[in-house]
Amino acid sequence: MNQVRKWNIIGGRVIKTGIAVFLTVLVCEFFNIPTIFAVITAIVTIEPTATDSIKKGLVRFPASTIGSAYAMTFTFFLGHQALSYALAAMFTIVTCQKLRLHAGTLVATLTAVAMIPITADHYFTAFLIRLATTSTGIIVSTVVNFFILPPHYVKTISGCTEELFVKTANVMEEWLTALMDGKVIKKETTYNLSKLTVLLHKAVQFVQYEQKDWKYHRHTKKEMRSFLLVQKQLHLLQQIIYHIDNLARAPIETCDWSQNEKEILRRTIHSIISILRNHCEKIDEEHFKLIDELDKQFWTNKNDLAHCKPNQYHHHFSSESIILFEILSIHDMLEELKQIFEKYESENQLNCSVY
C-alpha cells in the first residue's frame, strides 16, 4: 500500500490541471488573445471539488478585474515605475480584503503586477483583454473539473476509515503495554496518536468534499448507504480517538490495581482491540461480561472515593476511575458502530431481496 502511494505521483487534479492549461491555450490562440494570464487563472481554479471551482471562480473574476483596473490606472499616471507596482499590489490586496474576495486576492495581485511591464499603451483595451483571458481560464477550468475525472472521494474515505480502525487498535495496544508496565506512555505512542488525529481530519475533509459535489453526480442507493455508513463510522471513530487521547493523558503511574482488576482490564482492552480490527462487525458475549465487570469496578472505585475526606484526596475521580470511565465510553462507541453496521447489512439484504 505504501509502495503504491509512493509512486502514485500523478493524481486526478494534476491531470486535470494539464488538460485545463492545454485547452485554455487553444481557446486563447483561437481568439488571438494573450495566453499567460488565462493559464495562470486556469491553474489556480482547479479545486478539490467542482463546487469550489464554481464558487471561487465567481470570486476570482471580480478580484482579477480589480487588479487589472489598478494596474492600468497607476501605469497610465505613473508609467512603468517601481511605485506603480507597489501601489497596484497594495490597493489590489486592500480592496479584495475589504470586499471579502479572499480566494481571489493572490491571483488578482499577480495579475496586477504582471500587467504593468507588458502594457505600453491602449490601457483600456488591455484591461478588456485581461477580463477576456481571466474569464477563459475560469470557464475552461470549471468545465474540466466538472466533466473530466470528476472528483469522487468515496473509495478514499473508505480506505481512510479502514486505516483508522487498524491504527486506532494499534495505539490502544501500545497504551495497554504502558498500562500493564505502570509507566508513562512512550513518545512514539504520542506521535502515533497525533498521526491518527491527522488521518481522521483528512478523512473528514474528504467527506466534506464529497458532500459538496453530491448533488452534481448520480448515485445508486447502495453507494448512498455506503457513504452514510462511513460518515457515521468516522463520527464515532472521532469520539473513540478523543477518549484514547484522554487515556494517553491519564496518570498511569499513580494507579493501584489489584491483580484481578488488572487482568480484567487487560482482557477487556484486548477485546476492544480485536473488535476495532474487525471494524466492529461483531461483539461476542464474553466482551459484554468483561464490560459488566469493569462497570462494577468503576462504581466501586467511585463510591470508595466518595468516603475519602477532602484533606486526603481533592479530586472527584481517581486515576483508576478516569481510565475505567474512558474505556467504558469507548465500549459505548463500539456498540453504536456495531448497530450501524448491522443496519447497513440488513438494508443491503432487503434491497437485494426486492430486486
Swiss-Prot record:
Listed InterPro entries: ArAE_1
Source organism superkingdom: Bacteria
GO cellular component: plasma membrane
Membrane-spanning parts: 19-39, 74-94, 109-129, 131-151
The keyword Transmembrane helix is assigned to this record: yes
Predominant location category: membrane
Bilayer topology term: Multi-pass membrane protein
Pfam family, one: ArAE_1
Family per record: Belongs to the UPF0421 family.
Name this polypeptide is given: UPF0421 protein BCE33L2478
The organism of origin for this protein: Bacillus cereus (strain ZK / E33L)
Organismal lineage: Bacteria, Bacillati, Bacillota, Bacilli, Bacillales
